[in-house]
Amino acid sequence: MTTIATGLRLALVVAVVTCVSAQNSSPSAALRPLVLTGAIPLPNVQGRIDHFGFDPNRIFVSALGNNTEEVIDLGAQRVVHSIAGVATPQGVVYSPETNKLFVASAKGSVYIYDGTSFDLITSIDFHGDADNLRYDGADKRVYVGYGDDETAAIGMIDATTNKRLDEEFQLGAHPESFQLETSGSRIFANLPDSKQIAVINRKTHAISRWALTLQANFPMALDEPDHRLFVASRTPPRMAVFDTDSGHMIAALPCVQDSDDLYFDSARRRIYVAGGEGYISVFQQKDADHYQILAKVPSSLGARTAGYSGKMGKKGFDRLYVAVPARANHGAEVRIYTVQD
């Protein structure tokens, strides 16, 4: 009888410990919104890596410190071409209608390449720090953020003719990330030097400005249907949410330091923020006014730029691509994080 009672007590203890252990481990298992599933080496790439561009089967990576634009085939998961001679490349966009690749240089030019051969078609001089690029497929226009102080503006290129348009929007401070409305006429632009967000009406050319209490606002994403703008700041490190109608800040949550790219996953109502601190901040949008931190996904020190554009490639997986600069113990690479529901 004593042996039986002892066995029962032991079984009960094991069951309780197992239950508690399962309860403690289940949240971390459930909260894995991003899973590292691969990496694509960037051979011979040194220095800082800047922004990403996409077409349905390729990724374009601006290797700023290497003066190259790297072309990755998603199916093969390897670099298939390296465009040399691009002085400090920053923003990059692909125009599917014209099969052209546009690459912005910190030296002031935008280079235009054939999207198949990658032969240089022409370059356009914007006279200072051509940075972020955005493409409007409806008008076949490439929007270019460029300049400093008096020259700072968002200009435009006709993707069909390869000509710079006379029309531009003067801002008085260098624009970092900016987003275009697709169903409206506004552009939202981060102006970290003036601690503002500029709101540009493309039809009337009117520009309003939202003053910020946060500083160093670089990356940005737009949830157009819900009228929400997501902005990451570096001082302090925050992911802030703004009402695009009123300019009012709805929320501000702590996030990764040294952020440079931010994306909104409309299917899962999530925000991904990549930062040089060495992880990716993932937030959940509970509704348009309420947000919570979902996970801190490890990446690598200095990995502050990323690319996300929803389902891509033949398999149709949602993936976040994170640029990891070369270090003494490893080469440069693009890490692949598969998005989990």
Task: Indicate where each model-derived feature is located.
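N-terminal secretory signal peptides that target proteins for export/translocation
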Residues: 1-6
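Bacterial N-terminal signal peptides
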Residues: 7-19
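Predominantly soluble domains enriched in secretory-pathway, periplasmic, or organellar proteins
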Residues: 19-341
